[in-house]
Amino acid sequence: MKPANEIELSEVIRGANGPLRIVGGGTRAIGPLNAGEVLETGALSGISLYEPGALTIVAGAGTPLSEVEAELAKGGQRLPFEVPDLRGLLGRDGASTIGGVVSANAAGPRRIQAGACRDSLIGVRFVDGVGTIVKNGGRVMKNVTGYDLVKLLAGARGTLGVLTEVAFKVLPRPEVEATLTLDGLDPTAAVTAMAQALGSPFEVTGAAYLDGQVCLRIEGMAGSVAYRSAALVKLLGAGWDVADAAHSAKLWSEIRDMTPFVGKPGAVWRISVKPSDMPQVLATLNEAQTLCDWGGGLIWARVPDVNDAQAVTLRACLAALGGHATLVRASDSVYATTPAFHPEPAGLAALSASLRAKFDPRGILNPVGMG
């Protein structure tokens, strides 16, 4: 099913007799695909408003991300949160949609400075599980529902409603960027260096650690970037190299899109943890290739795709640390016994169930979309 507009979508959901699997570009699904009839949002497409002076863009949920980014580039602007393209990692085709970005609350390396997708999202329209059309945020800021639906819909993976339109605040594109790199650091030294850089006044917009190398990005006007890069090197000590804009852009696109893992076998974990706990988590993993982003707060790990892909050991470690792990890629045999999404604590699970009962009382929208 591919409804042509919001009214048709409402009618489809209202008349549904079973589960619906919501598909945008089909590029960000995690774990086994949901059962149910496919409901495509691709026809809910198009940029309805772009006001560069107001730093605002509004688009249909089915609008290709590339179309949104191209329009913003014409105005010298961009989405603040640096959307990852994980098609290579996940082995997916298709074109990512802006609604899919919101549903996954996708965010790349710049999250440490600009926030996640939900932090730039200012308005949504969606159809809930009984076919009601709902609008929240944007130009109508009064919240009459008692819920901050803008924040709730970001990251809900379609379990609370089918997005039809999204509105974002956007930011100017920086003039240049540069990246400081230092090789030969162990995880503890890497976390210390990244924390020192992120705690400085020099506005670091990327802090990653891979293959023993720490990478720190600075963006802005040319003069400012040159000054801040030099000042950061002075703060951190000798030995740092400074990559120019072209090399910096290539490096961070590879970090953002997980290029080091593309084409390599294995299960892949996406782990969220306090940056200071990064070394302990890395020590827990066996035979793992890792890439750490967000100053150590996000760990990507490629491990052997056998048994439970180290789920029991990893999640036990994270339970003690207050972190969580999502199995974003694995074989069917691993997924058969290992939930893709981290088990929720009892209180959070009850809250999630209550929200789903409110917005989708029949439980038909992406019924296993969150594990």
Task: Go through each PLM region and give its residues.
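N-terminal glycine-rich flavin-associated loop
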Residues: 1-20, 41-92, 102, 106-139, ...
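Short, conserved charged micro-motifs
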Residues: 66-68, 187-192, 223-230, 277-285, ...
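Conserved glycine-rich FAD pyrophosphate-binding loop
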Residues: 32-35, 239-371
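Short secondary-structure junctions
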Residues: 17, 198-203, 285-287
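Glycine-rich beta-strand-to-loop/alpha-helix junction loops that act as flexible
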Residues: 21-28
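C-terminal substrate-binding/cap subdomain adjacent to the FAD-binding core in PCMH-type
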Residues: 103, 122-265
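Short acidic-glycine loop/turn motifs at beta-strand connectors
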Residues: 34, 52-53, 128-130, 210-212, ...
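Residue-level signal for inorganic ion chemistry
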Residues: 62, 216, 301
